[in-house]
Amino acid sequence: MKVAWVTHHLIKEEERSDALLPGLYAGGAELNDAVMRSHQPTGYDIDVIGPDDWAQAMDYERVVITGTDRLSEEAMVQLATKSPLVWIQHAQQPAAARKHLFEKAAPFITMSRLHQAHEARWSRMSDEFVHSPVWDVNEVQPATKEPFALFAARNHPAKGKINARIKADALGVPLVELSNVDRSVVLEHMARAQWFIHLPKEFDACPRTVIEATLAGCEVITNAHLVGRLEPGDPREILTQQPPKFWSLV
């Protein structure tokens, strides 16, 4: 099946140190897209199409949309005629064309149960939810825990770095802050950290860092702005199920 994967979550053409994250991925959504595509079953031929070239997708057998932020109103209205799979990974800006796209999506997918409810306040309840996928569920393993807290996020005010400092001070524990460092460094610290603090200042839909901190055995401290966590159960088993779940809907 020929699949048009329409998104602005594009892999950078070259590694840059001045991006949101080092390496080829600007953030968690870019990683999510790349990981999900890496799990594609046989029989699918995927072309990644940027938002400015959306019209190319109209000729494809199946359309997958993983980012609507940079799609024009015309693009969303026209793409809606393809009954695309739409998988959104963060809070969406209410707009008539976007609501129409979600209504016509088959299916409309969010990141968690609470994310479903969040978007339903202005559009509709999503048909399904799919958590952030991982390349290897055994990549993140707990080590001997040490009495420090970890904050790891891209350098953005909404990620709540100041909130993390305040919380760590209230706990009376040292806080390690990691931004713009290689992912391997973050995972190594997660393995040892007793606490992972993520206190965002605005809506955050089931971020990868919280999932990875859960796999690392950290005590995750968050707030009401984090509206998504993994479903109850064995996190590795749950994450193993996410790519097959997604591709069964394509």
Predicted feature locations:
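Extended catalytic core of nucleotide-activated donor transferases of GT-like folds
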Residues: 44-107, 114-116
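Short hydrophobic "strand-cap" motifs at the C-terminus of beta-strands
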Residues: 6-8, 88, 111, 151-154, ...
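Catalytic binding pocket for nucleotide-activated donors in carbohydrate/polymer assembly enzymes
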Residues: 195-250
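N-terminal pre-catalytic "stem/leader" segment of glycosyltransferase-like enzymes
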Residues: 1-74, 221-228, 232-241
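Donor nucleotide-sugar binding/catalytic pocket of nucleotide-sugar-dependent glycosyltransferases
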Residues: 106-139
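Histidine-centered beta-alpha loop that forms part of the nucleotide-sugar donor binding/catalytic region
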Residues: 8, 67-68, 88-93, 113, ...
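Short alpha-helical donor nucleotide-sugar binding micro-motif in glycosyltransferases
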Residues: 188-193
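Conserved catalytic-core segment of nucleotide-activated headgroup transferases in glycan assembly
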Residues: 18-32, 38, 135-186
